[in-house]
Amino acid sequence: MAIPTKERGSRLTDADILSDLQMYKPVTDSDTRNVWAFWDKGLSNSPAWNQRNVISWVRRLSPKWTVRVLDLVEGSPNHVSQFIPREMLTDVFWNRTMTGPHVGQHSSDLIRLPLLYLYGGVWLDVGMLLFRSLDALCWNALEDPETPYEVAAFKVSMGPELSFLFNGFIAARRGSVCIKYWHEIFRTLWDGATSCAGMHSHPLLAHLPVYEPPSLNGKRPPFMYAQFADYLAQVFCLERLRHLVDSKTGWDGPKFFEEKVLLFDCVTEAYWAQRLTDWNGRKQYELLDLQRGEDGLDNARVKEAEALVQGVLSMSSTMKLSHGLVTAGREYLADIWDSPKNHDADIRPGTFAAYLREASETFEQTKELVPLRMPVIEKALLRAGVTEVVR
């Protein structure tokens, strides 16, 4: 499948775009098409492939969308404090006293919801490649006054009954009460905490069932459930809200999700490369690093690489490369590409990786999107205040 070429007007260099991304861009009342991302040390200090992801977003989405990557660099024009009032976040965030192996990820978790509530738009993790315009993916539906949708996201299925929302891609109208309450719950978990350890058993989440990841190979996951649930504490805060009915505020979680949340399948739309390779990051790296020349298509390994990239481009709107949980024996493509020796692995001429990089700027996915529902878990239903502990 050849990558269709799209007319995009004058093309700025990577350096030009990166320089522009360092500038402060205020949000006006009329701005709705905002893309939000975060790298605590500043975008220019992120791995090169992450920088190119964001640069590719700009090429794909400009001029309709404004991309901002916030940071925690002292004096930076894109410091989080330029966009979020201090009272919306905890002291552990502002004082940089968070601990644990995922400080960057959880700092990012803390800011994404305030940004969406205050300004609206789409949150993207910097590990995402785009293969479809955000307008076609979800924003046209959110913006249309004839539709009820306020929020759009990807659904992670843990089995026939259990599912949760992937927080690496969240789109929301400005002022969505769902985003507001979700953040209130998550912020409460961080009151007095310096790490995510033990958050899965916080009183606000203790009533939720165990969301055990499904086995892909007949074996149990290579990590403890508590480790998994603590890492994903933010998504379980939404599980509380999704199953909550609060008579004082009028919030009805099951009704809101039934009527106002636009959901698509997460594996199909973001993790198809992982599905095709049994979540083997080393295999993904080796296949994408192969040369794509026509002369090599008789080679079985090259055919496998071709099937991987064409599978992704025929199936997915995005491609998410996660670092995930630190797990013995598991490699992630994101970690491999982070290595300085692989600083150009996503753009090495003639490789399948370079083909995907080109696709992230020029290919437009047109596959029909099928909205999904999230089943209500009866034993998780709760009548209480948004942050009320019920014992």
Curated annotation (Swiss-Prot):
Species annotation: Aspergillus fumigatus (strain CBS 144.89 / FGSC A1163 / CEA10) (Neosartorya fumigata)
The text of the family note is: Belongs to the afumC glycosyltransferase family.
Q: What does this protein do?
A: Glycosyltransferase; part of the gene cluster that mediates the biosynthesis fumihopaside A, a hopane-type glucoside that enhances the thermotolerance and UV resistance of N.fumigata. The first step of fumihopaside A biosynthesis is performed by the squalene hopane cyclase afumA that catalyzes the cyclization of 3S-oxidosqualene into the hopene 21-beta-H-hopane-3-beta,22-diol.
**Temperature dependence, free-text field:** Optimum temperature is 37 degrees Celsius.
Give details on activation and inhibition: Activity is significantly decreased by addition of divalent cations such as Mg(2+), Mn(2+), Zn(2+), Ca(2+), Co(2+), Cu(2+), and Ni(2+); while Fe(2+) has little effect.
Question: Domain of life, per the record?
Answer: Eukaryota
Would you tell me the protein name for this molecule?
Glycosyltransferase afumC
Q: What is the lineage of its organism?
A: Eukaryota, Fungi, Dikarya, Ascomycota, Pezizomycotina
The EC number(s) given in the record are: 2.4.1.-
